[in-house]
């Protein structure tokens, strides 16, 4: 039977904090990514070998996407957005592994990621414009728009969370249902589709985060 996507399996407590299966899966993914990054970035050279050339190509591609949207130097935003898309790709695709639930298929992980984006948007906005200038941007183009602009900040964060959660959760639910009804090998084409959906959702989430940051720093229109 499929468990509710709004509830997670409780594993243990650290003090008053409940540690659930998606939390542990997230920790494992973070540790694995840290080890991989440590390994692949050792012994970087002026003349890159194939591994380094591939890494530089990925970084350049992500930086190019950021600059296309924000129209500013990508370096201040690259650590956040680059980490975000790498984590999302791995987290979304982890559900393909037997016995592993993608942490993004449970509501707490998309909610946490959306909150990270929410606070990062305001951080970059204040850093770029100053506190007064950034707060004044909520009254643009007219003061009457202030409540709507504040509401927009909240609703777009909520939609960012729901979009990621809904797409990944529904993919896992459908595959689990087909496995229960038809056997192990039938859902293989659906798993390929889930991989595609996971990659697309990682890209969309990161692009939307980039757009929100661009709006905060004044590079793209708010909306």
UniProtKB/Swiss-Prot annotation:
Record field: transmembrane: 17-37, 77-97, 106-126, 173-193, 195-215
Example GO biological process: proton motive force-driven plasma membrane ATP synthesis
Gene: atpB2
Keywords noted in UniProt: ATP synthesis, Cell inner membrane, Cell membrane, CF(0), Hydrogen ion transport, Ion transport, Membrane, Transmembrane, Transmembrane helix, Transport
Coarse class of the protein's main subcellular location: membrane
Self-association state and partner proteins as the record states: F-type ATPases have 2 components, CF(1) - the catalytic core - and CF(0) - the membrane proton channel. CF(1) has five subunits: alpha(3), beta(3), gamma(1), delta(1), epsilon(1). CF(0) has four main subunits: a, b, b' and c.
Family recorded in the similarity comment: Belongs to the ATPase A chain family.
InterPro entries linked: ATP_syn_F0_a_bact/chloroplast, ATP_synth_F0_asu, F0_ATP_A_sf
Name used for this protein in its record: ATP synthase subunit a 2
Pfam families for this protein: ATP-synt_A (PF00119)
Location(s) in or outside the cell: Cell inner membrane
CC annotations in GO: plasma membrane; proton-transporting ATP synthase complex
Membrane-related topology note: Multi-pass membrane protein
Annotated function: Key component of the proton channel; it plays a direct role in the translocation of protons across the membrane.
One GO molecular-function entry: proton-transporting ATP synthase activity, rotational mechanism
HAMAP family named among the record's database cross-references: ATP_synth_a_bact (MF_01393)
PANTHER family: ATP SYNTHASE SUBUNIT A, CHLOROPLASTIC
């Amino acid at each position: 039977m499929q468990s509710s996507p709004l509830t997670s399996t409780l594993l243990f407590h650290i003090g008053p904090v409940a540690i659930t299966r998606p939390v542990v899966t997230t920790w494992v993914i973070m540790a694995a990514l840290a080890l991989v990054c440590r390994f692949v970035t050792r012994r970087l050279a002026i003349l890159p070998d194939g591994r380094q050339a591939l890494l530089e190509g990925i970084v350049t591609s992500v930086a190019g996407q950021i600059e296309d949207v924000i129209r500013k130097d990508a370096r201040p935003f690259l650590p956040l957005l680059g980490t975000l898309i790498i984590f999302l790709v791995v987290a979304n695709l982890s559900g393909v592994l037997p016995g592993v639930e993608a942490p993004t298929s449970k509501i707490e992980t998309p909610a946490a990621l959306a909150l990270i984006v929410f606070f990062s948007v305001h951080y970059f906005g204040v850093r770029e414009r100053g506190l007064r200038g950034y707060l004044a941007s909520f009254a643009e183009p007219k003061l009457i728009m202030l409540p709507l602009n504040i509401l927009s900040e909240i609703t777009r964060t909520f939609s960012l969370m729901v979009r990621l959660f809904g797409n990944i959760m529904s993919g896992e639910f459908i595959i689990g249902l087909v496995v229960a009804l038809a056997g192990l090998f039938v859902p293989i084409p659906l798993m390929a589709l889930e991989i595609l959906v996971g990659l697309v959702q990682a890209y969309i989430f990161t692009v939307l985060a980039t757009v929100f940051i661009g709006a905060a720093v004044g590079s793209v229109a708010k909306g």
